[in-house]
Amino acid sequence: MERIKELRNLMSQSRTREILTKTTVDHMAIIKKYTSGRQEKNPSLRMKWMMAMKYPITADKRITEMVPERNEQGQTLWSKMSDAGSDRVMVSPLAVTWWNRNGPVTSTVHYPKVYKTYFDKVERLKHGTFGPVHFRNQVKIRRRVDINPGHADLSAKEAQDVIMEVVFPNEVGARILTSESQLTITKEKKEELQDCKISPLMVAYMLERELVRKTRFLPVAGGTSSVYIEVLHLTQGTCWEQMYTPGGEVKNDDVDQSLIIAARNIVRRAAVSADPLASLLEMCHSTQIGGTRMVDILRQNPTEEQAVDICKAAMGLRISSSFSFGGFTFKRTSGSSIKREEEVLTGNLQTLKIRVHEGYEEFTMVGKRATAILRKATRRLVQLIVSGRDEQSIAEAIIVAMVFSQEDCMIKAVRGDLNFVNRANQRLNPMHQLLRHFQKDAKVLFQNWGIEHIDNVMGMVGVLPDMTPSTEMSMRGIRVSKMGVDEYSSTERVVVSIDRFLRVRDQRGNVLLSPEEVSETQGTERLTITYSSSMMWEINGPESVLVNTYQWIIRNWETVKIQWSQNPTMLYNKMEFEPFQSLVPKAIRGQYSGFVRTLFQQMRDVLGTFDTTQIIKLLPFAAAPPKQSRMQFSSLTVNVRGSGMRILVRGNSPVFNYNKTTKRLTILGKDAGTLIEDPDESTSGVESAVLRGFLILGKEERRYGPALSINELSNLAKGEKANVLIGQGDVVLVMKRKRDSSILTDSQTATKRIRMAIN
């Protein structure tokens, strides 16, 4: 009561009433907002009124020694009054102008290095091309995009360690630089930023821009790579778009693009091998993209694409919980269902076993060119709202949704038999069978779906079976909208499992991804992809298989040679010879293999017939299961360049050419590397007879009798010594080996010993 009296008393004074009613700040919340906390609430206003004052800036006392009190025009540059609450000086904006014109000049060498991201951006814009502006409705959908062109892909923690090491090397705190990229970047930046005078904090901020991927969830119509996002405000408005071609590529976009291509190639190749999961892992681990190991990129790169996610799942990494069907990413936004096996009959009376989802569910569907909201019940499509770039894209989304709904009229619309197979020639599962069928031709599906009258709803139109828009009628439950559906924004990742056929499931057992979902689109990678795995040799065609097979043998010749002599079967079964088999005509593979294996056996048995070039040349043919036959061949055929080409068993051919003088091997005219023959072969096979199975002891010793010829050697007993005539009439003392196992090393040690013995 007392308070009210007091207030009444206050209000009776006319001035109080005037203040409280006429001034805009009559709300406690507002007063509180502008008077509490250190955070500036209206920075631009503050800036304006500060700059209207004479000395709005405070500076260190040293400024008074470095800047004169007045400029040429006699205007005061700083005040003798010190700033309240600190020992700084009050300074006029004119002092800044004076400093910019007359102040000391420091080296500018570090600016382009520290502000690299900005300098690069200017270059891209300078060389970019802006096209015409078009006015049209923009279907924008929010997507998670990379807003920071030109960055490396370090995690926040890794980047923090690099920044601390580069900018504050003497600060305390444990920093562990482990990854290849961390070490390279640290070394590079330390060298670049030696004697850098730019404020360390600024350097740290700029480094962060260079090292870490920053993503935002933005409305986009059109290109989503970072070089397009940086000009988003210039290229698309609410009702207009401006054509733009970036003036340069950036490493991060190139990595994303090349990673997708590598992952697709690897998943497609793994799917057709005997053990898809093992093959996939082997390929991921042996592939490099732009010189960086693919597995390192997969660990750091957040790109979400079907093939990339399958590779990540195989490596035990978490991936997004959304699932993929028909090239669309589905995310359940509400509802739930249970799965039950059901048998259904197609229009052709073929029985299909499908896993029916029972229950009401809502999904968002996001594809490259169309998006949709889907509401479905058990085997019934309740509503589908689609938006897309064009008629074709909208139709694709409708087909996928109709198949996904599992409606009976869709299954009855099948004409003919369903027998689609995947790359490994295995039948696809029923849902993908249906999808492939209608993607080929959806006419019957759309005709049989049913039509309904529609109400006029803003921003929505109906669509008829021939895909024409209509305001009166529409296919049942289906509408086309002007507004896009946003991509799923969450960056949450879940633990998944993968089976040996590369099907990825979440912890409830729902299939999120399978090789069928991997796009068949072929692209050209922007960064060099190096597949070291023999499984990927065929990606560039038969010639590449041929060259790679021979290069592999040459690179591993030392081990191959030992296996050739001690454990040939193991050698013949090596997976590196698998791709080569596809080049050998099927009908004759077995005979070739039998012939080459027999030839090799003779080489092992008969001293002096070991021939490096010939073994390398014929080895890949021995890998096929051999057929025993008495056939002899003087040449073997391989299918390259669209026809059969011959490899001569003895001698050179355009396919396989070894130049003894230069020691270079060329395959189909392409250099395949240097081939060092065994030293014992160069003197026309004479020395090799000595070496294999004999130990050279030194110079000739008369007490062991006259020099024997090569042929007489075979009569020696194990451990017996003799003088032998070798090569160009030199005589050396040898001993027949007591053990056969050491025969192989003879070839290597022999030459040295012969040279020593002769000299």
UniProtKB/Swiss-Prot annotation:
Superkingdom classification of source: Viruses
Q: Name one GO cellular component term.
A: host cell mitochondrion
GO biological-process terms attached to the record: 7-methylguanosine mRNA capping; cap snatching; DNA-templated transcription; symbiont-mediated suppression of host cytoplasmic pattern recognition receptor signaling pathway via inhibition of MAVS activity; symbiont-mediated suppression of host gene expression; symbiont-mediated suppression of host mRNA transcription via inhibition of RNA polymerase II activity; viral RNA genome replication
Q: Which GO molecular function entries does the Swiss-Prot or TrEMBL record give?
A: RNA binding; RNA-directed RNA polymerase activity
Q: Where in the cell does this protein reside?
A: Virion; Host nucleus; Host mitochondrion
Gene3D superfamilies named among the record's database cross-references: Polymerase Basic Protein 2, C-terminal domain (3.30.30.90)
Instruction: Extract the SUPFAM superfamilies matched here.
Output: PB2 C-terminal domain-like (SSF160453)
**Native source species:** Influenza A virus (strain A/Port Chalmers/1/1973 H3N2)
Q: Name the encoding gene, please.
A: PB2
Can you tell me which family this protein belongs to?
A: Belongs to the influenza viruses PB2 family.
Name of protein: Polymerase basic protein 2
Q: Please give the subunit comment from the record.
A: Influenza RNA polymerase is composed of three subunits: PB1, PB2 and PA. Interacts (via N-terminus) with PB1 (via C-terminus). Interacts with nucleoprotein NP (via N-terminus). Interacts (via N-terminus) with host MAVS (via N-terminus); this interaction inhibits host innate immune response.
- Marked site (Mammalian adaptation) residue numbers: K627
List the ranges annotated as motif Nuclear localization signal: 736-739
